[in-house]
Amino acid sequence: MKTNYLILGVSTLISKNVGHISQIIGPVLDVTFPPGKMPNIYNSLIVRGQNPAGQEINVTCEVQQLLGNNKVRAVAMSATDGLTRGMKVTDTGAPLSVPVGEVTLGRIFNVLGEPVDNLGAIDVSTTFPIHRSAPAFTQLDTKLSIFETGIKVVDLLAPYRRGGKIGLFGGAGVGKTVLIMELINNIAKAHGGVSVFGGVGERTREGNDLYMEMKESKVINEQDISESKVALVYGQMNEPPGARMRVGLTALTMAEYFRDVNKQDVLLFIDNIFRFVQAGSEVSALLGRMPSAVGYQPTLSTEMGSLQERITSTKEGSITSIQAVYVPADDLTDPAPATTFAHLDATTVLSRGLAAKGIYPAVDPLDSTSTMLQPWIVGEEHYETAQGVKQTLQRYKELQDIIAILGLDELSEEDRLTVARARKIERFLSQPFFVAEVFTGSPGKYVSLIETIKGFQMILAGELDGLPEQAFYLVGNIDEVTAKAETLQMES
């Protein structure tokens, strides 16, 4: 692919420092420069030339180490096939820069900020370097506020913090992608915000599927691309470790522009944060650093911190991040997930059991947690309602073994009432999504936090004990439950 030098923050490569490749070890290059002409750490270098077959080569690298004797060690952002010793390397004199702003919406980019969706070039008049400092303390917004998503189970039981970081846990086929798309849709409608999706080291097929589903659900508008609500940045499994290590920063940089310049609320999705750590581990080994615990890089905490600290609320806007977390061998004490947990404000756990029952979103109400669910943050009413819902569901879980063996009739009157209410709560936690309208045929619902609390209070208080369970399934607020119950009664 032809490299756009404007994207790299360089208008011309004439009069730049030029060196030559002295060693190639996979994706790592050693480059020798003339004395006194050494590039800085994180500067991007460009290797141009022709391979033995006569094809053009254009490889961008990032300086990682200064080795002495006028040598630097750099990591390639694309495949190093066809590179040979002695090839000329040009120092651009600046870190890698990527395009930012409205031009990125509805498009797919690689780590270098080049469009890879075959929809033509984009305007690159505004670029940001991918290595930036976290906002200063004086710019931070320290007020704790809830980020309302319009999804009942999330807002009530594991509320997101505005400018916070949320871990999304779930296996294959339980609805992670649909939940992500609904959040992208809701932030655009309710908050006037935009989203950036960073695909870090995941399957190319999944990235393609997500793009197709976003077009189908109109999150990406093919007819008018400027009406799209999301920018996509992909550095998938087949990319070299340098690209996978930096693609998260490319996505974050695009999100920072919307927060700092456009003063918007931004959702940043990173799928998968573990692959960011994994790529860093590969690069660390290639650079010859001594590995730390379990073979991870010694700079694990620093690398994670430099990414996570840039994700925050300022007085201008906010970046709320939702990060899919892969847990290797289901070991939560592994250094990669353990380091990630230190930064998270909430966890959303998707349950295969709920998905099997047809309850979507399949968010586990008992396993999902949030640091925001405190009475002095969300208020006494919200806190008490959430605790009541959790207690009822927990009691139902404890009684399930007895019900399976002896049947419902053997329970006490009080327990039978608890089970009936718990089953209604379980169904009321389901909700039709806007982005799933094309599959389900039922219109999506955005439920405000006030309506959510009111609905669950009425169920817990026994005001709706007379309504059938089916009336609570896949509806929005409590008024729709009573309307659905009347319809069911008329039909029967």
Swiss-Prot record:
GO terms for cellular component: chloroplast thylakoid membrane; mitochondrion; proton-transporting ATP synthase complex. The keyword Membrane applies. GO terms for molecular function: ATP binding; ATP hydrolysis activity; proton-transporting ATP synthase activity, rotational mechanism. It is an enzyme of class 7 (translocase). SMART domains: AAA. SUPFAM superfamilies: C-terminal domain of alpha and beta subunits of F1 ATP synthase, N-terminal domain of alpha and beta subunits of F1 ATP synthase, P-loop containing nucleoside triphosphate hydrolases. CDD domains: ATP-synt_F1_beta_C, ATP-synt_F1_beta_N, F1-ATPase_beta_CD. Keywords: ATP synthesis, ATP-binding, CF(1), Chloroplast, Hydrogen ion transport, Ion transport, Membrane, Nucleotide-binding, Plastid, Thylakoid, Translocase, Transport. One of its GO terms (biological process) is proton motive force-driven mitochondrial ATP synthesis. It is a peripheral membrane protein. It is found in: Plastid, Chloroplast thylakoid membrane. ATP binds at G170, G171, A172, G173, V174, G175, K176, T177. InterPro entries: AAA+_ATPase, ATP-synt_VA_C, ATP_synth_F1_bsu, ATPase_a/bsu_AS, ATPase_alpha/beta_chains, ATPase_F1/V1/A1_a/bsu_N, ATPase_F1/V1/A1_a/bsu_N_sf, ATPase_F1/V1/A1_a/bsu_nucl-bd. It catalyses: ATP + H2O + 4 H(+)(in) = ADP + phosphate + 5 H(+)(out). Its EC number is 7.1.2.2. It comes from the Eukaryota. Pfam families: ATP-synt_ab, ATP-synt_ab_N, ATP-synt_VA_C. F-type ATPases have 2 components, CF(1) - the catalytic core - and CF(0) - the membrane proton channel. CF(1) has five subunits: alpha(3), beta(3), gamma(1), delta(1), epsilon(1). CF(0) has four main subunits: a(1), b(1), b'(1) and c(9-12). PANTHER family: ATP SYNTHASE (PTHR15184), ATP SYNTHASE SUBUNIT BETA, MITOCHONDRIAL (PTHR15184:SF71). HAMAP family: ATP_synth_beta_bact. Produces ATP from ADP in the presence of a proton gradient across the membrane. The catalytic sites are hosted primarily by the beta subunits. Belongs to the ATPase alpha/beta chains family. This is ATP synthase subunit beta, chloroplastic.
